[in-house]
Amino acid sequence: MTDKILKISDEFWNIRGEFNIFGLLNIGTHASLVKRGNGKFVLLDAYEMQDDIKQQVDSLTNNGVNIEAIINLHPFHTVHIEKIHGDYPHAKLYGTQRHIDKLPNLTWQTELTNSNEFAALFSEDFEFSVPRGVDFISKNEHLHFSSVLAYHKESKTIHVDDTFMYFQLPGLLRFLKSPELAFHMTLSKTLEQRKGAADDFRHWVADLAEQWSGAEVLCAAHSSTLFIKNQSPSIAAMIMTALERVELTLKHHENKFG
């Protein structure tokens, strides 16, 4: 796999990159470059870009001068942060508490990306959502279900890390099975161990589908980018179908915790 940059709109570019596990399996990763209404840019998540990709980003952003913020949305995605901060040291650096704890040598902004205070700073261009009913930062560092989801209003694009995955078979194989949107397989292990957690998760998903019902693109970290415009089913409908597929998991959790 080679890094590539997908132009979603005149304001949104999704950078598709490599992430290898044990040097063997490339599960991919991503970041997004977004132009704000004020003409400045932000990076959603951090990724160490190959030279040709960085040249494209720099050409769009006046050699990076117009990148005003690097916004880290997944608490367990930390590998590329120091490099991208070194590339654009003037950009304000935002993250979760885990980012700050793991990289205390960097100059972090005080507003955590999973906070209302942070969301208010960028509310003209984005909406953000944090899953309810699941651990945001799991004690088990192998469980990466939760992240802050971002919705760019102008391009109608959802940027999401591990929470959602979009699967599409390659080439002619895609005719054998329709693409589908699914929740990350670690959901059952990250639901909060308390009464009502499963129902809180259901309501969060339903709220998300309603609030972002106009979404036409979904960029997911370890899978693919989903483009839907004036097509059926909508992304909102696919989100609700994904919820239906995990209903047995939620019922099992309710039977155990209430």
Q: For each predicted feature, which ranges?
A:
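Zn-dependent metallo-beta-lactamase
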Residues: 1-38
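Short, flexible loop segments at the rims of nucleotide/cofactor-binding pockets, characterized by
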Residues: 19-23, 43-49, 69-73, 134-140, ...
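Active-site HxH/HxHxD metal-binding segment of metal-dependent hydrolases
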Residues: 58-126, 237-245
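A general structural motif
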Residues: 38-40, 64-67, 90, 154-156, ...
